[in-house]
Each structure stands twice: as C-alpha cells, then as structure tokens.
A protein has these predicted regions:
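Peripheral terminal and inter-domain segments
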Residues: 116-272
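Short loop/turn hinge sites at secondary-structure boundaries
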Residues: 12-17, 109, 187-189
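Glycine-centered flexibility sites
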Residues: 6, 13, 17, 49, ...
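Active-site Gly/Thr loop motif
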Residues: 27-83
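Active-site-proximal alpha-helical segments within enzyme catalytic domains
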Residues: 1-14, 69-86
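Low-complexity, Gly/Ser/Thr/Pro-rich intrinsically disordered linker/tail segments
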Residues: 51, 55-57, 64, 74-75, ...
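Short Gly/Pro-enriched loop/turn and capping motifs at secondary-structure junctions
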Residues: 57-59, 69, 87-88, 230-234, ...
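A conserved catalytic-loop motif detector
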Residues: 1-10, 14-39
C-alpha cells in the first residue's frame, strides 16, 4: 500500500490512467512551507510541506510514519521506495542514510540485468529473522489446560496450549473482544491466517494484530513465543513460565507506543 501511494504521487495524481487528483495539488504537497533547520538529523533539517518531508536527494520527498515507516518519492530517478521498519527515533536517520548510500551505488553502476535480478531474488529468499533458541526443556504441565487471568492492561482473559506435532504448537488466546487462535513452529516462521474480527481495533492500543508469523522455542524450562506482524512495525515477544499451578507471562513489545511502552508481567489464577 505504501508503494502504491508513492506511485500515485509520482504519477502526479494519476492511477490506472485516471486522474484522481489534480497535478497542481501534488506540486503543492511536495513544496517546502515550513523551515525545519532546527532539527538534529540531516533528513529532518530540509523542510516540511503538506505531510511530506524534504529529503537529501534532489527533488526527493518522503511521508513518514512512526518507527521508520517511509514512503519515499524520487521524481528525478522515477522511483518510489517503501520501507516498513521497527525503529526507534535515533535509528530513523540510519535507515535513510543507508537508503541514500544504496541509491548512490546503483546510480553509479548504472546497469541492471536479468542475472542481477535473479541474484537479488535468491539473496532475498534466504533472509529471515533469527529463530528463537531451543533446548527442548519442555514444560508438559502447560498443555491441555486453560489458564485464566484477572483484569489486566492487555484485556487477556485466558490462554491455552496444545502440542500439534513435535515441532508445532497451537495457542488459543481469549481477549475481552475476540478469540485469537494461531500456530507456532520451531526453527520456522509459521504464517497464520487468524480470520478474527476486532470491532474496537485501534492501531495505538490493540494487542495481537491479525495474521502474524509465529516462532517458538523452549529455553531454561520456559516457553518463548515471538509474533511478527510483517505488514506493520510491531513484534511481540511472550515468555511463559509454569510454577506452583500458575502460568507466569512476560509480555515484551516493540516498538514502544502507548500500551506498548514497557513490558508487562502477568500471573494466571491458580489451577485448582
């Protein structure tokens, strides 16, 4: 979606051969109106237009979201760059600087070929986020029972686990507003289609977004679960420990925002 929006701006308001926005409005969007030379980072000092920041490359602008989400429009290069990242404020300039360095290199080489594209696709196919470590210190007590929680900031009512196969578990999560069922695998990112609805969705405060990639691992008699939402910026890490008939949950979110500003610790009600 970010790339499509950028292409729409690059096309001066045209999409699928239809002029949806007058070109003069696009020109106004990409014009600096506010002086920002008091900012710290190089790409924040060049000025601000209507929702767009001026960038270091000639005639380049970007719209910027929280945590390193960028849609960069480069009219001179006839190029759009869409970036979704999990970055805090101090990391944002590093992302842009790396982008300009890469852009300068490909302009210097001034070539591309089918072989280059094949090599790039092969390289990209091997990239993945690191898997959680696993020492097989399984906690059998957490399976086949439901752990219930009292009132908490996550609105978490209950959670249960079941072993589907030696390398796959199912996690059933009940919140105040919905049920959330997913699969997680060892040494693999398991894609989930949760098909759950949340009428009270709020990108600032909603916990557990749709369709995460899930990976888990056992370590030091704890179950670790990581949920990656690759259509956005957030990653949730959950650590489960079982002690004295209770489930101890450590919820650690990134990036830090609203309810995600700090880790949360929960203890389930005792299993009778």
């Amino acid at each position: 979606d970010l790339a499509k929006f950028g292409q729409f701006i690059l096309n001066k308001g045209s999409w699928n051969n239809k002029q949806l926005l007058a070109p003069e409005y696009i020109e106004k969007l990409l014009t600096v109106y506010i002086n920002t030379d008091d900012k710290v980072f190089p790409d924040s000092k060049l000025g601000y237009g209507y929702y767009f920041w001026k960038c270091q490359p000639e005639k380049a602008f970007r719209c910027a979201g929280l945590f390193g989400q960028y849609c960069i429009i480069l009219p001179k290069e006839n190029m759009v760059i869409a970036i979704t990242s999990n970055a805090e404020n101090e990391q944002k300039q590093a992302i842009l600087s790396a982008t300009w360095k890469f852009l300068a290199q490909i302009k210097k080489d001034n070539k591309s070929s089918t072989q280059d594209l094949s090599s790039l696709n092969n390289y990209l196919s091997k990239l993945h986020l690191p898997y959680l470590p696993n020492d097989n210190s399984i906690i059998p007590e957490i399976f086949q029972q439901e752990f219930k929680f009292s009132h908490n900031p996550l609105n978490l009512n209950s959670i249960s686990f079941s072993q589907i196969s030696p390398d796959c578990i199912r996690i059933n999560i009940t919140l105040n507003t919905r049920k959330y069922n997913l699969l997680a695998k060892l040494n693999t990112w398991k894609n989930n289609n949760t098909n759950s609805e949340n009428d009270n969705f709020d990108s600032c405060t909603t916990i557990f977004y749709e369709n995460p990639y899930a990976n888990y691992g056992w370590q030091n008699n704890k179950l670790n679960l990581k949920l990656v939402y690759n259509q956005g910026i957030f990653i949730d890490t959950l650590e489960f420990n079982y002690y004295n008939h209770q489930l101890y949950l450590h919820y650690n979110p990134t990036s830090s925002f609203i309810i995600r500003t700090k880790p949360h610790y929960f203890i389930s009600n005792p299993i009778k």
